[in-house]
Amino acid sequence: MIEVCCGSFEDAMMASECGVKRVELNSALSLGGLTPSLGSLIMIKQYSDIEIVSMVRARAGGFCYTNYQYEQMLENLKLLLAYGTDGVSFGFLNEDRTIDKNRCQEFLENVKNEGRKATFHRAFDCTRDPYEAIETLIDLGFDRLLTSGQEAIAEEGIHLLADLQKKYGNQI
């Protein structure tokens, strides 16, 4: 299935009109994608049947968050789930560039309790060891992984992408 990254209601409508079945809904794509507005989510649900995976990210500039930023993201997650997002894309890292298991687990519990899907986003591309990271994500129970193979674009990370797909593709 093709998933298109969208930064607005209009982007999602255009994707839907082109036959896309799933979008990752963001705001501020120029900042790498931040949490979208509830209004965008509500309107997309109202005007299309496209599957929506909503980004949960409080700010640009890395994937280690203060306690207040994390709390804000958790509140946004609960609202997005309550308003019908089909899935959620998020990622938390520790200062040493490993997966923050505790924060990911709390988010996953909220997502899974609502019967939705969880994607670990491109925070993966900032991890220190992609093999350790993907095994952690599988153990935690993520459904999908969004990565460019730890490079700026997927073409440059194709060798890592191919290896991860070969070794772990049936697990995440």
Q: Predicted regions: what is each one?
A:
Residues 1-8, 56-74, 118-129:
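Active-site mouth loops of central-metabolism enzymes
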